[in-house]
Amino acid sequence: MNSIDLPSLAEATPTIRHDWTREEAAAIYHAPFADLMFRAQTIHRQSFDPNAVQCNQLLNVKTGGCAEDCGYCSQSAHHDTALPASKLMDPKKVIEAAKAARDAGATRYCMGAAWREPKDRDMAPVIEMVKGVKALGMEACVTLGMLSDAQAKQLADAGLDYYNHNVDTSEEFYSQVVTTRSYGDRLDTLAKVHDAGIKVCCGGILGLGEKPTDRVEMLRTLANLAQHPESVPINMLIPIEGTPIAATATPVDPIEFVRTIALARIMMPKSDVRLAAGRTAMSDEMQALCFLAGANSIFIGDTLLTTPNPGDSKDRQLFNRLGINARGELGVHVHSHG
């Protein structure tokens, strides 16, 4: 383990960098736990309220039948997961769901469709959804797969605020997870989204069989982009029967997960770090450590796409125990985002 110079941490400022090396990122990740947490919490407090958590709502507007072969995903047409494919939801029903989320305190709404990439004919109903959400006074986010420049511009013109497009893991490990697209394809879409003026939401998944080095490299890739993603969701794998990775997945050590959250906060000090999927398998104590390490955002509701989530009642109890700001219907500072 590498020791970190504590006096320098006390004077740490949230400097935005895009030139992190493998060696320094790894040294931070593997530092003594107390030193790592101190540095992450110090940086976190300089940009965020340490007692506030952003809450995000996510709706699956098109389920299953995806042409990609992501080894963890129940929505891939390549896997036998007994998940029926559905058509794109009626925009009116999506907007009704967004209104319910707004009435529960949400200010941002994310809509996900299980596509490799949207066809041009898909854009009109998606744009209707985006405009409908915006008309409710909410921010809008979508995740649709890869985009063309023209599609990114269409979404920007419709007023889209955020686009979610995760890199999942490191470039070195990526081919062990997905073979139907390249890591470069993901980065290319991120560039198109950024160039269109849409904010980027991009993170990854822990528990795919990756090594700690892969977690470090995933975050280093994001931190070294021309602009840091405005949101960085960190997911813990929920193994789904019928997916290839479920057969070989091993649980992520809780401390290793917390280290990843801390590294994300240190390397991307102004970004929201989202404690995303997998919270049903986390103890309250593990989640508390993640918040202490710099996580300032979660997903609310009973489900995330096709996987379970703790639900508002349980989250409210946790937030009350931790003294998290009591604002909004859930009892926290509420936004809604994917």
From Swiss-Prot:
Q: In which pathway does it act?
A: Cofactor biosynthesis; biotin biosynthesis; biotin from 7,8-diaminononanoate: step 2/2
Protein name, as recorded = Biotin synthase
The superkingdom of the source organism is Bacteria
* Naturally occurring in which organism (per UniProt): Rhodopseudomonas palustris (strain BisA53)
- Name what cofactor the protein needs: [4Fe-4S] cluster; [2Fe-2S] cluster
Spell out the reaction equation it catalyses.
(4R,5S)-dethiobiotin + (sulfur carrier)-SH + 2 reduced [2Fe-2S]-[ferredoxin] + 2 S-adenosyl-L-methionine = (sulfur carrier)-H + biotin + 2 5'-deoxyadenosine + 2 L-methionine + 2 oxidized [2Fe-2S]-[ferredoxin]
How is this protein organized at the quaternary level?
Answer: Homodimer.
PANTHER family per the UniProt record, alphabetical:
BIOTIN SYNTHASE (PTHR22976), BIOTIN SYNTHASE, MITOCHONDRIAL (PTHR22976:SF2)
- Paste the cofactor note: Binds 1 [4Fe-4S] cluster. The cluster is coordinated with 3 cysteines and an exchangeable S-adenosyl-L-methionine.
The UniProt record lists the EC number as 2.8.1.6
User: Top enzyme class of this protein?
Assistant: transferase
Alphabetically sorted, this entry's keywords are:
2Fe-2S, 4Fe-4S, Biotin biosynthesis, Iron, Iron-sulfur, Metal-binding, S-adenosyl-L-methionine, Transferase
Gene3D superfamilies assigned to the protein according to its UniProt record, in alphabetical order: Aldolase class I (3.20.20.70)
The record's listing under InterPro entries reads: Aldolase_TIM, BATS_dom, Biotin_synth/BioAB, Biotin_synthase, Elp3/MiaA/NifB-like_rSAM, rSAM
Give the UniProt family note: Belongs to the radical SAM superfamily. Biotin synthase family.
Q: Which SMART domains match?
A: BATS, Elp3
What gene is this protein a product of? bioB
- Answer yes or no on keyword ATP-binding: no
